[in-house]
């Protein structure tokens, strides 16, 4: 399995420092509102795609569609202090180490400068502004460290003027991010890949657990459709409710063998509680079958109880679980409090609150 052993975050959004150790195949993050759960998933995505200069803006767009401009990248910096570099580091399961640092800076652009001065009277004033986001990253393996840099720049009008890809680096891993916003998900790419590999039946089999009438899934014009017993035509998933759409998005991404890492924000969104246990079983089974690592956030107590029930019935998955309560403590800042299956089981049996610890 390719993936993460640990993750360390410094100065990213509201997280000054957070270290998460002993990551496993399926990792669930709990916590109160604004504890940093979603930020953890964003950091995992960024460090997996650290050579992609478009990724930071895409991450912001997923979080809030109205904050997808270059200027909004400042929200990734602590308290909008652009002089403090966010850093994300990790040790991977293949014993390589990764480090990514984000930096806002000014890079002189001859073309933009010429356009700005065209037809104007030259002055001695230097007009500069932060126009470039640099993604400086390192890969260390067997004592050898390699450094790379990607960047994206804008002109005076705020439009992207240049992008620089890291030379000599090719990312071998792929992460799929499933946001809390139900409207943002589309399983088309995953289903197309599964169709090419003749593995689409894996998804149909799991969809039958959600609704036993489902007998097919198809992609037409980038839209997902399902076939159902007793109905003569395919039905658009988007017209069948949030529950099926959410379930299909997660199952298709989990089944796609090209995705090494699955990131699911607020897994319970759009789903009726009766589907939770079936979905947990699908996630663990597909992660094992396709050898991938999964990261999930939730604030639903019912979701945790159904997870416990599923693991009671499927003991083969118990060792694969890690549960982390993320807490911004008064004395120690952000902390990750870890539990394994035994801790989850005990908490559910004794009605112990896991989603937030007041310290």
Where are these regions (language model features)?
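Pre-Walker A-like glycine/lysine-rich segment at the N-terminus of P-loop NTPase domains
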Residues: 1-49, 60-65
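Phosphate-coordinating catalytic segments in nucleotide- and nucleic-acid-processing enzymes
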Residues: 50-257, 261, 322, 327-359
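Loop/turn-to-beta-strand initiation segments
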Residues: 258-260, 291-295
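Walker B catalytic acidic pair
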Residues: 265-267
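Conserved hydrophobic alpha-helix in the ABC-type ATPase nucleotide-binding domain
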Residues: 279-283
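H-loop/switch region of ABC-family ATPase nucleotide-binding domains
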Residues: 297-299
């Amino acid at each position: 399995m390719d993936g993460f052993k640990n993750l360390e975050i410094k100065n990213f959004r509201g997280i000054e420092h957070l270290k998460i150790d002993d990551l496993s195949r399926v990792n669930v993050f709990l916590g109160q509102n604004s504890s940093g759960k979603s930020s953890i998933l964003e950091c995992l995505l960024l460090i997996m795609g650290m050579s992609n200069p478009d990724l930071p803006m895409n991450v912001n767009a997923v979080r809030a569609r109205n904050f997808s401009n270059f200027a909004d990248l400042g929200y990734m910096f602590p308290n909008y202090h652009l002089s403090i570099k966010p850093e994300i580091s990790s040790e991977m399961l293949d014993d390589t180490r990764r480090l990514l640092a984000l930096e806002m800076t000014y890079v002189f652009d001859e073309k933009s400068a010429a356009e700005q001065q065209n037809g104007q009277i030259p002055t001695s004033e230097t007009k500069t502004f932060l126009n470039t986001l640099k993604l400086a990253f390192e890969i260390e393996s067997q004592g050898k460290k390699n450094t790379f840099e990607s960047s994206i720049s804008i002109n005076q009008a705020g439009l992207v003027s240049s992008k620089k890809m890291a030379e000599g680096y090719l990312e071998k891993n792929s992460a799929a991010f499933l946001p809390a916003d139900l409207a943002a998900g589309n399983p088309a790419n995953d289903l197309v890949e599964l169709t090419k590999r003749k593995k689409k039946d894996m998804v149909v089999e799991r969809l039958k657990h959600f609704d036993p009438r489902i007998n097919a899934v198809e992609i037409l014009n980038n839209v997902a459709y399902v076939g159902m017993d007793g109905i003569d035509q395919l039905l658009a998933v988007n017209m069948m409710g949030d529950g099926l759409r959410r379930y299909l998005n997660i199952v298709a991404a989990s089944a796609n063998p090209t995705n090494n890492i699955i990131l699911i924000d607020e897994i319970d969104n759009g789903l009726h509680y009766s589907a939770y246990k079936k979905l947990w079983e699908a996630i663990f089974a597909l992660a094992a079958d396709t050898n991938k690592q999964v990261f999930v956030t939730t604030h639903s107590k019912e979701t945790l109880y159904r997870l416990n029930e599923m693991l009671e019935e499927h003991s083969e998955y118990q060792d694969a679980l890690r549960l982390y309560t993320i807490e911004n403590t008064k004395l120690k800042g952000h902390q990750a409090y870890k539990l394994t299956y035994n801790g989850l089981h005990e908490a559910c049996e004794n009605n112990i609150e896991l989603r937030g610890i007041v310290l």
